[in-house]
């Protein structure tokens, strides 16, 4: 190799007159090749990771798009825990464990093919021996790992989901489990779920760690066998024997890491099959694209000037049971309407239909003669303010909580909404006022103040209609009375629809809709319904309302 004459025909422009210069040239060439190779591999790693991250981004974005834009009835089929699990966890595991490992597998297969291919050109026997070694190694490893990784694939997704559910159950219900003194029960459930999942993780880690040692043993055996073969073939030429043996050693030790990575990739691909299957099923069930996307920035509205009419509204979550049956009533501008009934009467479902979250199976809703449909309901929503039973408080400032969902925040409108909700005096005591941050779980706001914050959020957009869905059910009597008085004040400029099962909230309404088993029993004032219906009068007595 160091003979200058060997290179004279290939690089005549370089004068090589001794072995030292030749050695330096070879050294520089090898250095350049390795530097170039490593720069190229670094670039490939960057491209590969970017490709995988973009893929994860696209998949999670598709899921989020579906959960946000799809019809509300469709998204109700997936629980909140499963939605978080699909977006936050399963996508990363599936893409990293399957796609990323698949790319690593392909890269290392190419490396092995190139090494063996180059060997075949000049050294067919060592190349054949190397190919045989690779084939035998992969066969033996797959024979050992295939069934074992199949077991991982069948159980890993299930165990991981149980583990995540146990975490969520403990964290979300911390207050209740402390009151029940059930800390040990829930902790034991968590540790059991974690133990099962960690056992699977241990096996996966073990299977990932075994291949290097397994391949190293096979290399030693292969080298001993090759030494015997090459010695017999090149008995008359020691230099040829050394060269052939050196080439095989170099090839095997270069191929060995690639074989390790290939086997690790195969193990990870096999163990994440269930995650890939689940994400494919979820992706297919999403029916992406089968929904309309409306631009809220256009601020298109249906102006409410006179009357909203509900005609023969029927709805069911499944064909077996009808939740709403022929619901018909009118809402005049300026009305303070209460919808009353026991749990299961269909009150909240009716609110969801009024807001367009759920489409009625039959019947129609008219706003000043304009029929609402899925194509124009978004215009009607722009004049609606909605106050839920449980407010979602964000870990942001008060003004960001009030103006939630708006790109640009108007401080004057925030203050106006807070004053209308009778909360501004409380917030003004904070150091930074409406710019003060609310920390979830330790914000110091009472339940009544949180509900006022929800009302301020609903009032921020200056809606013409306010819908309260069981908004006072979690409040004590005094706070409920204060909010009811506040609603009386607001009702002078808004149309209010209040849904409740507590009569004290609705006594101030000018019209009450009494519901039972998905039907409207009657519509009238508080006194009229109390006089006509013993069931209603019994509710009055139970509520201790005089």
Give the predicted meaning of each segment.
Residues 76-82, 155-203, 271, 276-279, ...:
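Loop segments that connect adjacent transmembrane helices in multi-pass transporters
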Residues 103-155, 225-240:
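Transmembrane helices of ABC transporter permease
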Residues 388-437, 535-538, 544:
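Conserved "ABC signature" C-loop
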Residues 1-36, 120-132, 236-242:
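Transmembrane helix-loop-helix hairpins at lipid-water interfaces of multipass membrane proteins
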Residues 178-182, 206-209, 254-284:
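Cytosolic ends of transmembrane helices, especially the final helix of ABC transmembrane type-1 domains
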Residues 355:
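Helix-to-loop junction immediately C-terminal to a conserved catalytic motif
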Residues 382-385, 390, 401, 417-420, ...:
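ABC-family ATPase nucleotide-binding domain "signature/switch" substructure
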Residues 68-114, 172, 196, 209:
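Juxtamembrane loop-to-helix connectors within ABC transporter transmembrane domains
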């Amino acid at each position: 190799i160091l003979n200058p004459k060997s290179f004279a025909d290939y690089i005549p422009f370089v004068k090589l007159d001794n072995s030292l210069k030749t050695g330096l040239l070879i050294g520089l060439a090898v250095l350049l090749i390795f530097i170039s190779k490593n720069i190229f591999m670094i670039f490939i790693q960057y491209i590969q990771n970017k490709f995988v991250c973009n893929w994860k981004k696209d998949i999670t974005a598709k899921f989020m798009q579906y959960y946000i834009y799809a019809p509300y009835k469709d998204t109700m089929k997936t629980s909140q825990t499963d939605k978080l699990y699909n977006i936050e966890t399963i996508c990363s595991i599936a893409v990293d464990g399957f796609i990323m490992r698949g790319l690593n597998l392909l890269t290392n297969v190419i490396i092995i093919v190139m090494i063996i291919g180059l060997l075949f050109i000049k050294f067919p026997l060592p190349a054949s021996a190397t190919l045989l070694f690779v084939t035998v190694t992969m066969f033996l490893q797959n024979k050992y790992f295939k069934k074992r990784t199949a077991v991982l694939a069948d159980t890993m997704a299930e165990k991981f989901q149980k583990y995540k559910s146990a975490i969520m159950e403990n964290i979300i219900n911390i207050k209740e489990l402390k009151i029940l003194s059930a800390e040990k029960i829930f902790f034991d459930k968590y540790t059991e779920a974690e133990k099962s999942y960690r056992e699977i993780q241990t096996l996966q880690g073990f299977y990932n760690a075994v291949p290097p040692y397994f391949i190293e043993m096979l290399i030693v055996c292969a080298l001993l066998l090759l030494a015997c073969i090459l010695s017999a073939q090149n008995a008359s030429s020691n230099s040829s024997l050394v060269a052939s043996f050196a080439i095989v050693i170099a090839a095997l030790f270069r191929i060995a890491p690639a074989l390790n990575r290939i086997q690790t990739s195969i193990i990870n691909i096999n163990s994440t099959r269930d995650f890939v299957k689940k994400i494919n099923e979820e992706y297919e069930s999403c029916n992406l694209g089968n929904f309309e996307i409306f631009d809220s920035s256009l601020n298109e509205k249906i102006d409410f000037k006179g009357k909203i009419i509900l005609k023969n509204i029927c709805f069911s979550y499944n064909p077996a049971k009808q939740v709403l049956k022929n619901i018909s009533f009118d809402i005049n501008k300026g009305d303070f309407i209460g919808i009353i009934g026991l749990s299961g009467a269909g009150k909240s479902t009716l609110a969801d239909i009024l807001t367009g979250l759920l489409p009625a199976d039959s019947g129609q809703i008219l706003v000043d003669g304009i029929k609402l449909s899925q194509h124009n309901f978004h215009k009607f929503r722009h004049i609606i303010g909605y106050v839920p039973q449980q407010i979602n408080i964000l870990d942001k400032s008060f003004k960001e909580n009030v103006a939630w969902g708006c790109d640009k925040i108007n401080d004057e409108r925030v203050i106006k909404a807070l004053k209308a909700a009778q909360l501004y005096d409380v917030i003004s005591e904070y150091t930074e006022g409406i710019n003060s941050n609310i920390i979830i779980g330790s914000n110091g706001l009472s339940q009544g103040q949180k509900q006022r914050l929800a009302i301020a959020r609903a009032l921020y957009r200056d809606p013409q209609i306010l819908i309260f869905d069981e908004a006072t059910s979690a409040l004590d009597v005094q706070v409920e009375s204060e909010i009811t008085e506040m609603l009386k004040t607001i009702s002078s400029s808004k149309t209010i629809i209040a849904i409740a099962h507590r009569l004290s909230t609705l006594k101030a309404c000018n019209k009450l809709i009494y519901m039972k088993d998905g039907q409207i029993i009657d519509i009238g004032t508080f006194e009229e319904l109390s006089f006509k219906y013993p069931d209603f009068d019994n509710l009055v007595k139970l509520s201790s309302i005089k």
